[in-house]
Amino acid sequence: IAINELAPRVHNSGHYTIEACHCSQFENHVRAVLGWPLGNPQMVAPAAVMVNLLGTEKTSGQPRGLENALRLAGVRFHVYGKMMSGAGRKMGHITVLGNSVEAAQSIAECAAKEIYFG
């Protein structure tokens, strides 16, 4: 068994649950901590794709290119509010729901190409 990471918190790989599931990882985390029953984690769409938005250089954390990205059907944008960007730094993410992974992936990739920080 190989273990990559243990994270006793919500994790970036589950951010898609904000839009894609009846109950997000964030809500279920709070429910678990409070001893409440967990919510329904089932997806609300047949497919979902989440793409991290990474910085490319040390510059302002201000997102740019949103106008074109948000014109694409179903794109949900999340910015993490970091003041400065850096190469490989996670600055936000986008999520796209769709009828297939391929369709959602295509839209998500197009949207991600439009967004940059600076």
Task: Give the label of every model feature segment.
Residues 13-15, 60, 86, 103:
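Intrinsically disordered, low-complexity acidic/polar segments
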Residues 27, 51, 64, 75, ...:
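A generic structural signal for well-ordered alpha-helical surface patches
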Residues 22-26, 69-73, 96-99, 113-117:
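Short, low-complexity, polar/charged sequence segments that are solvent-exposed and flexible
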Residues 7-58:
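Active-site "cap" helix and flanking loop/linker of ATP-utilizing ligase/carboxylase catalytic domains
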Residues 1-5:
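Protein kinase-like catalytic core scaffold
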Residues 44-45, 51-85:
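Glycine-rich active-site loop/lid that clamps phosphate-bearing ligands
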Residues 79-118:
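Generic C-terminus detector
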